[in-house]
Amino acid sequence: MNALNAAMTVIGAGSYGTALAITLARNGHHVVLWGHDPKHIATLQHDRCNAAFLPDVPFPDTLHLESDLATALAASRDILIVVPSHVFGQVLRQIKPLMRPDARLVWATKGLEAETGRLLQDVAREALGDDIPLAVISGPTFAKELAAGLPTAISLAATDPQFAEDLQHLLHCGKSFRVYINPDFIGVQLGGAVKNVIAIGAGMSDGIGFGANARTALITRGLVEMSRLGAALGADPETFMGMAGLGDLVLTCTDNQSRNRRFGMMLGQGMDVQSAQDKIGQVVEGYRNTKEVRVLAQRLGVEMPITEEIYQVLYCGKIAREAALTLLGRARKDERSSN
């Protein structure tokens, strides 16, 4: 591969970053995958698969591993960031001096900025300036199913229409991967952060043993909280009925491939927060997302009772069953009430 002719450079060689790189390469594109640990990248290169997360999916020949960040970023103008939300800004500051002048940035990271609750678009603008085209992809995607080529659909939003069309062309595969362009840049970002929080709550409910009725009620009211917060930010309400909203919410709340759901189930069964995180063994994005979403909601004056009770469990030592009873004991109200 010539150093300057890759279709995409993927930053982040975990399960999801690897799955997206495989998908792009399977579409016939040359793709560079970079990770922060040179030993991990060397292992991926030797094995030609991600044995830790996706052991049964061999890498296409057009997927190239790279441990040198400058080389990886020189390979393509288009950069796909797939890292946990709490290091998103740090990674952008790291890559900025190495990016090509014509670079465009897209991320699959789901979350908000740690501590501040800012949207990742604001973090990107602060780190990279106002001129670079930005995009985000989000939706119901488990890495194993995506890498295996099972049917999957996502939403894509971008600040530049041409960038959106180019990304759709790169990612979309009629056999297995549908990519829907959505003009709502704010809503597509927000859905992925809030659904992680609600998924912890759904897991708690099931861990307590409340059953399918309770889980469904929690998902539905969680969607209300997502939509309410989105409205305060100026998002399009229809976005939350799409892949980046309802789609991702249902997937994450109902399937045990979701780390957030499994984490919540352990809490509902009485396990403490640290032990549950240790047992999961990977990043539980919803743990940090809960604090970030709460900060954002408080700043905007948006009431999010489910998010608040999950926060109380994660950060204040409240028992999951007590949090559930607090929600059930709330005053009667109209279903369409704003609080």
From Swiss-Prot:
EC number: 1.1.1.94
Catalytic function, reaction form: sn-glycerol 3-phosphate + NAD(+) = dihydroxyacetone phosphate + NADH + H(+); sn-glycerol 3-phosphate + NADP(+) = dihydroxyacetone phosphate + NADPH + H(+)
Lineage: Bacteria, Pseudomonadati, Pseudomonadota, Gammaproteobacteria, Enterobacterales
Residues binding sn-glycerol 3-phosphate, per UniProt: K110, G139, T141, K195, D248, S258, R259, N260
Listed GO biological process terms: carbohydrate metabolic process; glycerol-3-phosphate biosynthetic process; glycerol-3-phosphate catabolic process; glycerophospholipid biosynthetic process
Active site, UniProt feature: K195 (proton acceptor)
Binding residues annotated for NADPH, in chain numbering: S15, Y16, H36, K110, A143, R259, V283, E285
Main localization category: cytoplasm
The protein's name in its UniProt record: Glycerol-3-phosphate dehydrogenase [NAD(P)+]
Cellular component terms (Gene Ontology): cytosol
Highest taxon listed in the record's lineage: Bacteria
Similarity comment: family membership: Belongs to the NAD-dependent glycerol-3-phosphate dehydrogenase family.
